[in-house]
Amino acid sequence: MVTQKIYIELKAFDSCLLDRSARSIILTAKRSGARVNGPIFFPRKIMKFIVNRSTHVDKKSREQFEIRTHKRLISLPKANSTIIQALMSLQLPAGVDVKVKVIGGSNG
């Protein structure tokens, strides 16, 4: 049987949605018999935008906006084909960006 190490990186603007998605991935992996490390919390990234309210005058009057991006990492150290199939059939919400990185392919 071929075992692989899988890293699943999740990004979202909504932290509650991100935590729910991470929890469903972890429960699915544990039901399939995988050992799970995580979720590992990364620092949130805050991008701030400051815009003048009026076009040419009144420099003191400004509007502030920000976007907060939350990240989580889930690691599956020994994943086989049944675990991968279970994770591929999982339905996640549209607001969550998922990146999967597969490392290795040694026989175990």
From Swiss-Prot:
Phylogenetic classification of the source organism: Bacteria, Pseudomonadati, Pseudomonadota, Alphaproteobacteria, Rickettsiales
Family to which this protein belongs: Belongs to the universal ribosomal protein uS10 family.
Record's function text: Involved in the binding of tRNA to the ribosomes.
Entry's Gene Ontology BP terms: translation
Signal peptide region: none
Protein name per its UniProtKB record: Small ribosomal subunit protein uS10
Gene Ontology CC annotations of this record: ribonucleoprotein complex; ribosome
Keywords: Ribonucleoprotein, Ribosomal protein
Pfam families: Ribosomal_S10 (PF00338)
Disulfide bonds: none
